Amino acid sequence: MDKKINLDYLIDDIIVNSDDLTPFQCQICFNSVIDFKKETLSFDVLQCRNGHISCHECWNRQLSIKQECPSCKVKTLPSELSRNIFLENAFRALKVICPNKFKESKFQGEAVHCENGCPEILKVELLEHHLKECQYQFIKCPNNSNKCKYIIRKNQIEHHNQSVCDYSLIQCEKCSELIERKKLNKHIESECDTLMITCSKCSASIGKKLMNHHLETDCPMEEISCLYKAGGCNKRFLRSQLSQHLSENNNHIFYIQNVMDLHKLQLDECNQDYRKLEKQNRDLEKRLFYLESTVNSTVINSKPHECGGGGGGGSGNNVYKGKWVINNWDRKLREYPISKSLNSPFFQIGSSKFFIMLYPNGNNEVKGFLSIFLYKIYDRPSLVKYSLEAKNIDPTKNYKNTHTNNFINNNGNGWFKWIENKSQNGFFSNNSLTISISIKIIQDHSLVTE
């Protein structure tokens, strides 16, 4: 941002005709009643009840000493001063020259006209707006205010930048870097990246910017390590001797083999890490599928007579009756392709935990049908009779399967081909599927040690 320089001037310095100021003289100090020292001009002209005027400063000083008009001695309080609108309007119409017509500083207390200054003559009331836009106002050099002390007119800044200021940024014609004008010659002679310099190792002429790359990859006289240092060869030699060095020791076969063995070891470690991460990923996916099905995707009926989360319902602790409601069925078909299962929340009969595993698009090679299985978290062998019933919008078409199975491990039991997953068959009304669950543990095979 341009740093504007505020000029020191009075109305007497800029008035076109000095006689025009006579009606506006303060009766005490004889200066103008308008204060031109303020940043924002105030045109208020204050008078006593008899019409005598003074500047604001003199009114304040006079009334603090004695509350009377210094001209007519009439009693006057600060609150009784009134504005002289006629004089205010007359003052606004006075013609003045732009203060930027003068040089930056006065000479022996007098404003000095400058031939390069602003030629504008305008009314007093337009002066404040003009000064904000005037291209002849003085500003500090914007390039480096801590170094360049130049104060210039705003309309000369371009010339100052291009021809005068030592701190303006000039683009180097060779490397395009922006450099201060005073440093440009030194930059071109000794610092520019495109400067051709001599390599201290091989005496080749190389661009300064490319010297590091030359030493790292090309210079024949640069000392380097063997390509097979990782294989045990620790010799150093000039780059120009690389071919000769590699031909030694039976063409470095021993060191090459060491490098290959090292790479094989690293590859084996990577494979082990990969298999470990792959297993962790599978485990996490299983947990995620279960959480999705239990938290976001399913509803378990929790009426007391249908066995909530506690010790079972129905006729005793060996019986469970409930239902599993699966909402957003169309989304489940998309999210669970063939062989991907959706699991119900756990439910409990006595101390035994169960859950339902459902395949919306079928398991293995079964397509077009739902696959459904009952799983028992294995604690001890149990003979279980269970039924799973798909509820239809027409109750006469409900589909129920019943089976008795001896659960002796963690494997599930159920039907690969259960109901068709057609949206029009009445099982998926309101985009949801409801499965009634009935389970009875006929016999627990407890292990007893005496």
Swiss-Prot record:
Alphabetized Pfam families for the sequence: MATH_2, zf-TRAF
GO molecular function: zinc ion binding
Subcellular location: Cytoplasm
SUPFAM superfamilies: RING/U-box (SSF57850), TRAF domain-like (SSF49599)
Coiled coil location: 257-297
Zinc finger RING-type: from-to: 26-73
Stored InterPro entries: MATH/TRAF_dom, TRAF-like, Znf_RING/FYVE/PHD, Znf_TRAF
ZnF (TRAF-type) ranges: 129-185, 186-243
Ranges of residues in domain MATH: 319-439
GO cellular component, one term: cytoplasm
Highest taxon in the source lineage: Eukaryota
Keyword Electron transport belongs to the record: no
UniProt entry keywords in alphabetical sequence: Coiled coil, Cytoplasm, Metal-binding, Repeat, Zinc, Zinc-finger
Function field: Probable adapter protein and signal transducer that links members of the tumor necrosis factor receptor family to different signaling pathways by association with the receptor cytoplasmic domain and kinases.
Record remark on domains: The MATH/TRAF domain binds to receptor cytoplasmic domains.
Similarity comment: Belongs to the TNF receptor-associated factor family. A subfamily.
Name the UniProt record assigns to this protein: TNF receptor-associated factor family protein DDB_G0273433/DDB_G0273509
Naturally occurring in which organism (per UniProt): Dictyostelium discoideum (Social amoeba)
